[in-house]
Regions:
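A transmembrane-helix-recognition feature enriched in membrane-embedded lipid enzymes
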Residues: 128-150
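A structural signal for short, hydrophobic/glycine-enriched beta-strand patches
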Residues: 1-132
C-alpha cells in the first residue's frame, strides 16, 4: 500500500477507512496495524494507520503496532504473533479487495481458525466493474463459502 512521506497512499487510505468502520462496529476487539517503513516513507505503514485511526477516535489502547514487516507474509506472521492467544480463533483481515485472495491463502497456512474478511475497495474509476464483480464472487465462493460448508 505505502506511505508518501507521512500521507497514506490511496490504497492504504481505503484500508484505514475500512478498519475504522470495522473497529467502530466491534468496539471490544484489538487491532494489529502491520507494515514497515519503505524507501521514501517518513513513517511506517503501521504508524500511518495508527495516526489516522486515533485521529478518528479509535482508542490507542486497542491498537498494536507491527512495524518490522516488509511483505505480506511477514505482515501476517508478525501480526499473528502479537495477538493474544484467544484471538487466534477468529481473525479479521482488512486489506484491499484485490489483495484478499493471496492473504487468505497465506492465512490458511498460518493456521488461525475463522477468518473474517474486511475488504477495502479502491475508488479508481478505470477498474472494470465486470472484473471486480466476477472476482468478488470468486473470492467469496472460494475463500468464505467453501470453507464454511466443509
Amino acid at each position: 500500500a505505502g506511505v508518501n512521506g507521512t500521507t497514506p497512499s490511496v490504497a492504504l487510505q481505503t484500508r484505514i477507512d475500512a478498519a475504522e468502520r470495522y473497529l467502530k462496529a466491534h468496539p471490544d476487539i484489538p487491532a494489529v496495524l502491520s507494515g514497515g517503513q519503505g524507501p521514501g516513507e517518513d513513517i511506517s505503514e503501521a504508524r500511518a494507520m495508527y495516526d489516522a485511526l486515533t485521529d478518528r477516535g479509535i482508542d490507542p489502547e486497542r491498537l498494536i503496532l507491527e512495524e518490522q514487516s516488509a511483505n505480506t507474509r511477514q505482515n501476517l506472521q508478525n501480526s499473528l504473533a502479537l495477538l493474544p492467544d484467544d484471538y487466534h480463533k477468529t481473525v479479521a483481515i482488512v486489506t484491499n479487495d484485490f489483495h484478499m485472495g493471496r492473504v487468505r491463502l497465506l492465512l490458511n497456512a498460518a493456521g488461525p481458525g475463522r477468518v473474517v474478511q474486511v475488504p477495502a475497495k479502491l475508488p479508481w474509476w478505470w477498474l472494470s466493474a465486470n472484473y471486480y464483480l466476477r472476482e468478488s464472487f470468486a473470492v467469496v465462493n472460494d475463500q468464505v463459502v467453501r470453507p464454511l460448508l466443509a
